[in-house]
Amino acid sequence: MVGSQVKSWFKNAFTYDTNKQSNTWDECLKADCFFVCLPTLYKENEGYDLSILEETIDNIPDGKLIVIRSTINPGTMDIFQNRYPKKKFMFNPEFLTELSAEEDFKHPDMQILGISKESSGMATEIMLMLPPAPEMRIVSLIDAEWVKKLRNAFYTTKVIFFNQIYDIIEKTELADYETIRSIVVHDPRIGNSHSFIKHKGYRGFGGACLPKDLYSLIDFAKKVGANSELLETVKKINKYLYK
């Protein structure tokens, strides 16, 4: 989802896409900075498939700045920076919805740029190239990775919370969920997003981002020996809601 939005913002940039008309790879190699927007498919208990990402990084010459926007686990960017010490890495997570991806990219609610020691000298320049946002932060690579992971995990939890409240209210047959919802979401600590019961005709959460980010976080927690009971419950409830 991310590549076309980046292309629309950087109108004079070289672009390379094996599935669409684009510049040649040799033309792209003239650039000093590469925004890498590639799919990282996720399989439960196996992790993200980083092969296409790693292949692309291998083909970018030393000394270049590489800004990754693909979805990955916390710690992945530090692994890349250590593996390729002569390249400079940044992580700029996407916060897009499928229905309004281009608008979300051009008018983000936050702009987060994760940097390494090797890329820190270009941090301000790159940040100013990106669409402005009310919250603009330059942080470590791993903190930027966690911001993306936390947001999406919270959204999944919020969806399930509102679905559970809906079911409880419906059982009473006295109160109106939509009236109640439309009032409480005016509390800025709660907000309107992810409070509607049906999305695209189904309950629960689906799509390309939320499920895989939740599942990957649960698997990540298991690997580091952390308790993820709440997240596992969210996953379990969603499996019977999402029909």
What residues fall within each predicted segment?
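NAD(P)+-binding Rossmann beta1-loop-alpha1 motif at the extreme N-terminus of oxidoreductases
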Residues: 1-33
